[in-house]
A protein has these predicted regions:
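Rossmann-like S-adenosyl-L-methionine
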Residues: 166-345
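Class I Rossmann-like S-adenosyl-L-methionine
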Residues: 1-179, 228
Length: 345
């Protein structure tokens, strides 16, 4: 539901002539969940979805809304024609699905609105088109609908678990949905959940020989673990301003021999040979993994991020050893967060 929120509310609005967020919250939530089941989950019979939704609304204090919920959901089933193998962004009668297929609709629900068809806010879509053009923007938007797989990798001296599927890049594996993630990581602690594109950024520094390394904005420690695997003899420190993520980092730190600097403690007393700055960004390169990013990717948000990124880079340079190396990384595809930062720093 989260991933397809805007597409679902557009369809519900078309079927009901009502704005979903103005409905009583339990009624709107029921319609969203039921519509997602009708459009995206093929194994659940329509009558089961509708009966369950109506029954839930009745039992949870909204008996007067049962007729409305029933009518809207039945209208949605009548809007569907057939599932076609390949959906097309821009076809107003296509409800796109994550596997590339689409429900062909009997009415033009998404007329002139690729943004709503793919689940982007209007401001985010405007930014996407401005930066990349409508054709590429549509390709990016369609790609964001798919549910991204969980990908793992291991240090060079370890093999991937037998339970994972081979990725196109032999260093990585795709975790099947039936594998217990907790057991997987407990059995192999140095395993990392990491995409190839994220991991590959550290390939730029793997031939260096740094004595002291700092990972700023370390999050839960994914790149920190990778740094330890690359540089087993280096002193490695990490920082993370978010309390929740830093708690995970602190739990990991003893296992990989990393110092975690806290906001209320003394920082480093010596400069670093290598500083890794994987900075907060718009997540525009990972829309499929961060569905919420499609709602906030606009000029105002990008401008605030660019300012924050510049501050982090300036701080990073201030603790960098003379002739040291600074690795700047984002998971954004927006030029303002990437190449445009180079002249400033």
């Amino acid at each position: 539901v989260h991933r397809r929120w805007i597409s679902l509310t557009t369809l519900i609005g078309h079927a009901s002539n009502r704005i979903v967020h103005k409905l009583d919250a339990p009624v709107g939530a029921t319609l969203l969940v039921a519509t997602a089941q009708l459009m995206l989950l093929d194994r659940i019979p329509d009558h089961a979805v509708i009966n369950c939704a109506v029954d839930w609304v009745r039992k949870n204090g909204h008996p007067r809304a049962t007729g409305f919920v029933n009518a809207v959901l039945r209208k949605i089933t009548r809007l569907r024609s057939e599932i076609i193998e390949t959906g097309v962004a821009g076809e107003s009668d296509h409800f796109l699905r994550g596997d590339g297929s689409a429900w062909k609709l009997v009415e033009p629900v998404f007329k002139d609105s690729i943004d709503f068809q793919t689940g982007f806010s209007r401001k985010s879509w405007t930014r996407l088109v401005h930066e990349f053009g409508e054709k590429t923007a549509a390709e990016i938007a369609v790609g964001s609908i798919a549910e991204a797989p969980i990908i793992v990798t291991a240090p060079e001296n370890e093999n991937l678990p037998d339970t994972v599927l081979q990725h196109d890049d032999s260093r990585f594996g795709v975790v099947p949905q039936n594998v217990d993630l907790a057991n997987l990581f407990m059995s192999q602690p140095m395993l990392r959940a990491q995409d190839p594109t994220s991991a590959n950024s550290l390939d730029l520094v793997k031939d260096l020989n740094p004595r002291r390394i700092l990972d700023v904005c370390a999050g839960r420690g994914t790149k920190t673990k990778q740094l330890r695997a690359l540089f087993p003899n280096a002193m490695i420190a990490a920082t993370e301003p978010n309390d929740v993520r830093r708690a995970f980092l602190e739990e990991l730190a003893p296992e990989i021999d990393v110092i975690v600097y806290k906001p209320n403690t003394d920082g480093p007393t010596e400069p670093f040979d290598l500083v890794v700055a994987d900075v907060p960004c718009s997540n525009s390169g990972v829309f499929a993994r961060r569905p919420e990013a499609r709602f906030r990717y606009d000029k105002k948000h990008i401008d605030s991020l660019v300012e924050l990124q510049q501050e982090i880079l300036q701080d990073a340079r201030s603790i960098l050893q003379n002739k040291g190396h600074l690795l700047y990384a984002t998971c954004s595809i927006d030029p303002a967060e990437n190449t445009s930062q180079v002249p400033v720093n």
